[in-house]
Each structure stands twice: as C-alpha cells, then as structure tokens.
Amino acid sequence: MKFSALLSQCGLRLILISVVSLMGFLVGPSFAHAQTAPSENESDTGIQVDKPSKLRNLVPAEQLERAADKQFNQMKREAAQKNALARDDHPELIRLRTIAQRLMPHAARWNPASSRWAWEVQLFGSNAINAFCMPGGKIGFYLGILEKLKLTDNEVAMIMGHEMAHALREHSRERLAKNQLTGIGAGLLSSILGLGDLGRTVMDYGAQLTMLKFSRDDESEADLIGLDIAARGGFDPRAGVTLWRKMSSASNKTPPQWLSTHPSGTDRI
C-alpha cells in the first residue's frame, strides 16, 4: 500500500473518530446534563432540576420567539378561515384565560425572561386531544381535550402548567440546537463512510432515538414544574393523578413507551 493511500486512510479514520466523539460529546447526556444542579430559584421552589444545556445558546431566544409568534398567528388565521377559532366570548376560552391568569404570575420564578412575554391563550375547534405553549408564551388548547376528557379546572391547570413549563425551560430551543448538531454530524459521517442517502436516513433514525431520551426527560421535568406552577396558582396538584388516568384511558393505541416522546400515563401517576 502506498504511503499516500495509507495516510489518506488514517486521515479518514481520524476524522471518523473525531466526528463520532464530537457527536457523543455534544448531544450525549454527559454534556447536555453535565452540571446537574438546582435551578437558580431552588430556594424559592424547593424543586431541584438540571441546569439547561448550554447548547440552547446556538438558537437565539428572540429569533425563536419571533418564529413562534409568526406560526401562532398563522394557526389563528387558518382556524378563523375554517370558523374553528373560538370567539373571545366562548365559555371554554374564558375559562382557559381565567386559569392562565392565575398561573402566569408564577412563571418568572422559572424563567425571568417570561415577565416580558406577550402571553396569549387561544382555543382551536379541533377534536384532537392536545394542547401546547410555544416559546414566548403562546398557549393553544384544542376543544377535543376539554370535551373528550371532561376536564375540571384543576386538570386544565395541570395541563397548562405542564405546557408552560416546556416554554419556560426552553425545551424547544434546546431540542432545535441538538437536532441541528446531530444533523450536521450525521451528514458528515455519512459522507465519510460513502453511505449516501441510505446512510443518512439510518443516521437520522439513530439521531431521533438519541433525541427521544432528552425529550422524555423534558416531559418529566415539565410535569414537575407544571405541578409547582399550578399549585402556586391555587389549584389542587392531586388533579394530576385523575388527569393522567383520563389520558391513559383515552389512549387506546399508543406507540411503545420506549419510542414515545411522552412517558405513559401510568408512569406519570
């Protein structure tokens, strides 16, 4: 074997090792949760959570909030065109906003920046059992989750607190940053190995499974912080048990827990 060929092969091995090491370092638990420490406000909450990953700084918060605001407005426009956006006098929307008003004052202890957010609550006329809170405090509930589960105010507060916690802890921002890094690493590794599109697809699947662990951790953290926010708003945290029992009963067909981004209802109980 010629020296140049040997050198080239060694170089490829070195690059390959570097890429694999870099991906493991950047998206692995050892870095993402390198500093397992109390939140800045543990003295106020008594709840210990991991410090947010520094990777989130790769995605500017302001840019993400602007994108979320744009997406939320688009959702409202599309829903309004289908007559599926609740009017301000809709009883369920009034109920949601009343509950939100009791929770919002307790958000800043988990993210001081939320004090400047333009919080907004909307109700969409969909049968889906779902709710969300986008970065920047854009809260959306689907009518299906209220009607199909027959939620009490306490149970609504549990869901709303949970979704608010995702935004407050910047889970979307962190996951986007990690997805960008795994995408870059997967593409580079596939090119080095000469696997082409097939290799990229396989690597992407692996990247998704890597991300699921973080997502499941995010869900558990949101459960804990959501309970804190709801309880401080004067709602009964025991409603979390009845809520997840309802969720479990409503989920007739769910993916295996290991491949799910949400822990099962029974695990949450």
Protein language model features and the residues they cover:
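A Zn2+-metalloprotease active-site environment signal
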Residues: 2-269
